[in-house]
């Protein structure tokens, strides 16, 4: 089915483009959400008549999205979750959880705007994209930790890595040496007991 796009759609086209899409995609997504019109002579005339208004509306939405993007870009969200010894979560962190945390921070974001390919299932720091407008996409950092203190330690380590990468590498090397020494001591204790 050929449709006329009423707004920019990622991986498809820009406003006013006539594109060929699968019938189901048009009927189930583009047409109901008023993101496109079926291609016909009357719809082409309608689009050309409304083009200036649609462009003005699109610019207004883009401006609003950019205003939110300034506040949201680079935000660190802390998600406290229970996890096993290996760092694997007992549950997961999904787009819904991220949306709920953003709402608690005062942002009005729909779940579909959080671009998360798969749920987060391990502790750590994750870069996540949020699409505020088809042309405005920001990146936030989701920190998944067992506690607030662990999240702050992770944030401090990441900040140290950004400020002085050579010091961070040295800190990681020292941490690995200390861990290896601890394991060697445990092995020696087991040998003496055995």
UniProtKB/Swiss-Prot annotation:
Gene Ontology CC: ribonucleoprotein complex; ribosome
UniProt KW keywords: Ribonucleoprotein, Ribosomal protein, RNA-binding, rRNA-binding
Gene Ontology terms describing biological process: translation
GO MF annotations in UniProt: rRNA binding; structural constituent of ribosome
Glycoprotein among keywords: no
Purpose: Binds to the 23S rRNA.
Family according to the record: Belongs to the bacterial ribosomal protein bL9 family.
PANTHER family xrefs: 50S RIBOSOMAL PROTEIN L9
Name the UniProt record assigns to this protein: Large ribosomal subunit protein bL9
Organism per entry: Rhodospirillum rubrum (strain ATCC 11170 / ATH 1.1.1 / DSM 467 / LMG 4362 / NCIMB 8255 / S1)
